[in-house]
Regions:
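A generic structural signal for short
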Residues: 62-63, 102, 123, 154, ...
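Conserved phosphate-coupling serine/threonine residues in phosphotransfer and NTP-handling enzymes
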Residues: 127
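Glycine-centered short loops/turns at secondary-structure junctions
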Residues: 120-121, 198
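N-terminal helical cap/lid subdomain that shapes the substrate entry/recognition surface
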Residues: 2-108
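Asp-based, Mg2+/Mn2+-dependent phosphohydrolase catalytic module
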Residues: 1-6, 19, 111, 115, ...
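Structured helix-beta-strand junction loops
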Residues: 51, 119-120
């Protein structure tokens, strides 16, 4: 297949949300004196992360609104300790999100891959991340010059994996489905979403997870593997 257009996910495909997000949470833990609730950061992290993953899955499927996600993910870990004020969680979320914009660690091989791809393809970001932080993260981490446009779910009015998100990106990038491939780490949002939109997929799967229900067009365990495909 000859591709001309690359739709690329941002978080945990290019921008290292696991490392950067963990750093921000550890700063929050110390600055907000969370040792009063959890003796160690690891204990707090192990409570926060499962809830955060669950809420993001609900957000992707349109089951909750952004406002519910950003409040509940910070309120849930401290609710057992009598903290129930949504405005407190909102302030904490705003602080956390601002901190993420200053983190610049990328997935290993990101810039080398983008340097290789830039002369050959038109590249676009497709992300469910929040508008107020994604543009800053992209710019501060040096990714902006590589991409023709950045497509966010908030601008499209729907999230990956919904087909409307992919249709929005195709239309606004003047791209054809059969000349486009989606690159991402999320099975549900990126890979299943692209397949359901009749777009080929490259699954970035560093954890060697099993596919669910179908075989993606391509699978790689590191970003360097994409150079063998494109």
């Amino acid at each position: 297949m000859t591709y001309r257009n690359l739709f690329i996910d941002l978080d945990d495909t290019l921008w290292d949300i696991h490392h950067n997000g963990r750093e921000c949470l550890e700063e929050i833990y110390h600055d907000y004196h969370y040792r009063n609730y959890y003796p160690t950061f690891e204990e707090y992290y192990n409570v926060y992360m499962p809830g955060n993953h669950r809420l993001w899955a609900m957000y992707r499927q349109g089951e909750i609104r952004k406002e519910e996600l950003i409040v509940e993910r910070f309120l849930a870990p401290v609710r057992p300790f009598g903290i129930t004020d949504p405005s407190y969680a909102k302030r904490l979320s705003d602080d956390f999100l601002e901190r993420t914009t200053r983190k610049t660690r990328l997935i290993e091989g990101t810039l080398e891959l983008l340097d290789y791809l830039r002369p050959k393809y038109r590249m676009f970001i497709l992300s469910n991340g929040f508008r107020e932080v994604q543009h800053k993260k992209i710019e501060n981490s040096g990714l902006k010059p590589y991409f023709e446009k950045i497509f966010l779910s908030e601008d499209a009015g729907t999230n990956k994996p919904h087909p409307d998100m992919f249709t929005y990106a195709l239309k606004n990038s003047n791209s054809r489905r059969n000349q486009t491939v989606m690159i991402g780490d999320s099975w549900d949002a990126d890979i299943a979403g692209a397949r359901n939109s009749r777009i080929d997929q490259i699954w970035f799967n560093p954890g060697s997870l099993p596919p669910q229900g179908f075989q993606p067009t391509y699978t790689v365990q590191d970003l360097a593997g994409i150079r063998e495909i494109l």
